[in-house]
Amino acid sequence: MANVYDTANQMAADIKTTQEFQDLKKAFDLLKLDTVAYGLFQQFQQKQYEMQQKSMQGQDFTDDEVKSLQELGDKMRDIQPIQNLMAKEQGLSQMMDELNKIISQPIIDVYQGK
């Protein structure tokens, strides 16, 4: 019987060699060179994390929190290194979605009686 954890670890290593992953890594490295863009990116990540924590605790977001996150997102949309990173994230996400479909297929087959 195959050890699925070994297979998963190999897949993780293989993902690092894909063009999509390499493009994302390069885009992130370039983003870090722009201190203003990287600072905004870090602020956005922190706010997202804080809101996710509140959500997990069943707490509602204040209008100010939502507005602050939206304003920060709006600022980020105009910054080229962030736009580039987001585009590369989409490419990697598409690949990950395709992999998830492949991995999930046996479960789908069970429920479809295959």
Swiss-Prot record:
Pfam families: Com_YlbF
InterPro entries: Com_YlbF, YheA/YmcA-like_dom_sf
Alphabetical list of Gene3D superfamilies matching this protein: YheA/YmcA-like (1.20.1500.10)
Domain of life the protein comes from: Bacteria
Family designation: Belongs to the UPF0342 family.
Protein name: UPF0342 protein LCABL_19440
Organismal lineage: Bacteria, Bacillati, Bacillota, Bacilli, Lactobacillales
